[in-house]
Each structure stands twice: as structure tokens, then as C-alpha cells.
Amino acid sequence: GCIASAGYQWSEVRNECIRIWEVGIELLNLDEISTSAAYLIFNQDSGKVEVFLPGDANIILTKNENNWIAVGSDFSIAIEGNSFVLYEKEVLKYRSEQGVPK
């Protein structure tokens, strides 16, 4: 298992223990009341992305043309401008500030 006390969590798409803030892309919560962030962890070919949401189970989305979706999930990820954006039920919830890697 992962050493949670050292900040490690299991990543399904990477198949290893990771520290999400070290390898993930941080998404800022657009709700002005909340300061919690979400993180995106991509697999090697970016065909799958694991979403780490505060307080929720991880969600794995699969690339579909220019976005990532999961059947039966309320979440989707897209690239808008130079940012990743996370939608829940078609409402924009999170946005990255660091830009989209090339």
C-alpha cells in the first residue's frame, strides 16, 4: 500500500503510489467560498486521466476527440485556451492555471 502519512495516494492510471501535488496538474476551484483544489493525473499517452477531487473517490475519464469523459459520470475535462477545465453536469467547476503541457 501507499504511505498516506507521507502524502502518497494510489493512482490507477499510473499503477503506482504518487504524491498528487508533485506529479499532477492542479485545478483551482472556481467556487469563491472553497479553497480546495482538484488534480489531474494522466497516463503515459494521455488517453486516460484520473481526477482527484477533494473528499471524493477518484474518477477515471477516457479521451474522446478533444476531451475526456466517462460513461455514467457527471464529469468531463476539456482544454479551453491554454487551460484544462473540469465540468460537473456541464457546469464549469475547476480550471488549471499552469497551462496545458505540449
Where are the model-predicted features located?
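Short, surface-exposed linear segments at secondary-structure transitions and domain or protein termini
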Residues: 66-73, 101-102
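C-terminal partner/receptor-binding element of secreted or periplasmic proteins
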Residues: 76-102
